[in-house]
C-alpha cells in the first residue's frame, strides 16, 4: 500500500492537500503509509498482554482490544457497512466507543463523531448532510435514551440502519451479536482516506464536517504524544467526551494507545469521581477545559485527595486565566500544559521544559516545524510581535477545506490554503500565542462552541417570536454564557416556555441560552444591522454593576 500524491477530493468531496504539499510532508516523514487500525495492531504486537483500556467493570489487554475491534469490524461488514460509507457515531465515553472507532477505521467507514450532548436536531442534521448509511448509538447516553430518536431517524429516511450498543428491538439492531463474527484481519482503509469527521462549532446552523485523514491525523497524534511526553508508562484519564478532538487525539486516547500506555475511561469529569479514579488507577495524565480545571482546584484545596501519581494536566478549549494557571502546580501537584487547538488542525502546546512565564501566560506554540502561522489584520497583512490579529494557518495536519462546502471553503480558506480560524491572537517573537478573543459569531461556553445563528433560527421559527439574536455574556466560570434577546409577538411567550421549546426541538442542552430577555427592539448599527456589540456591552455593564 502506497500513499498517493493524487488529490482524492473528486471521489470523497473533501479538499486534499495539493500534490506538492503531499510530497513535502511525505518526504519530511510526517505522513506514513499507515491507517489507525494498522497503528493499533502495531501497539498490540509490541505489548499484547499489557492493559490498554479499563473502566469500572472491565480491563482489556492490547491483544483482547485488537481482537474485539476486528470481530466487530467483521460483524459490521456483514451488517452491510463498506469502505467509503459514512455513519454517525453517537456514544458516551466507554470501551465500546474505542472498539467501534477502530472497527470502523479498519473497514474504511467514516464516523461522524457526534458528542454525547447532541440530540435529535443535531444528529438528524449530521445524518442528512453526510448521507449517513447508519446511526450507531447506545441504550443510554448521559441519562438520555436515544433509541426513540434512532427509530425516528429510520422512519424519516435520515439513515438506513440504526445499530445500538445495548438492548435493541426491530427496526433497531443490537451490536452485541456482531462481535461473534470471525475476526477480520485485512484493513480496507488507505492512509490517504478520510478516517473520521470531527465537528466544527461554526457560526451557522449548517453542519460543518471536518475530514481528518489517516495519514495526517496519525501525525497529529504521534507528534502530540512526543511533545507531551506520552510513553508506555502513561495512564490517561478521559474526563472530557472521547469524541472531542482534544480527548481523542491531542494526544488523548489514541495517543496513549499508540504509545502503549493505559486509558482509564470515565463518563464523568467531576472532582469527586475523578479524584477517586486517579488514586485507584495511578493516573498520570488528563485533560480538562478551564471551568473543570477551576472546579478541580477548588475541590482539592478543601479535600486534599491523593493525586500523587498525576504528572501532567492539559488545559484547553478556551483560555485559562493566569491566576488559575498559577494554582495548578501547588494545588494539584502536577505540571500544567496549556493547549490551543482546533478540530480543523492546528495545535499549540506549551512545552514541558518551558519556563513558568510561558506556561502561565501563553497558550503555547505550534506542534509541527511545518506549521505555517500568520497573524493578520483585516486586510490580510501580517502584524508584528505582540500585536493582535486573526490567526491563520496551513500545515501537515490542518485541513484544506470542510466536507461538501465549496462556497464556505472559498471564504474560510485563502487562495494559498491558509485556514482563517476566526481566533484573535497575539504572537511573541518566539512564536508563542496568546488568545485574545474571537472574530466569528460564535460563543465558547466552557469549551463547547455554539453557533449563534443556529439558535437564532430555531427561536425565529417559534410562532410567538418576531425576531431573535444571540450573543455571548461574560462568565467567571465558563468564560462565556449565552443570552438570547427576543422581540416577541403577542401574546408574548415566557423565557421558560422558549427554553422548553428549544429542548423540544432536540437542541443540545449546552446550546439552550442561559438567559432569554424579551425586548421591544434591537440596537442597530449605522447601516441598519443588529448591533450585537451594543448588546454585549449592555450585558457587560449590567454584570459589572451586580458584582
Swiss-Prot record:
Its EC number is 6.2.1.61. It is an enzyme of class 6 (ligase). It catalyses: salicylate + holo-[ACP] + ATP = salicyl-[ACP] + AMP + diphosphate. Disruption phenotype: Insertion mutant does not produce Dha and pyochelin. GO terms for molecular function: acid-thiol ligase activity. Transmembrane segments: none annotated. Pathway: Siderophore biosynthesis; Antifungal biosynthesis. Keywords: Antibiotic biosynthesis, Ligase. Involved in the biosynthesis of the siderophore pyochelin. Specifically adenylates salicylate and loads it onto the holo form of PchE via a thioester linkage to the phosphopanthetheine moiety. Is also involved in the synthesis of the antifungal antibiotic dihydroaeruginoic acid (Dha or hydroxyphenyl-thiazolinyl-carboxylate), a precursor of pyochelin. Belongs to the ATP-dependent AMP-binding enzyme family. This is Pyochelin synthase PchD. It comes from Pseudomonas aeruginosa (strain ATCC 15692 / DSM 22644 / CIP 104116 / JCM 14847 / LMG 12228 / 1C / PRS 101 / PAO1).
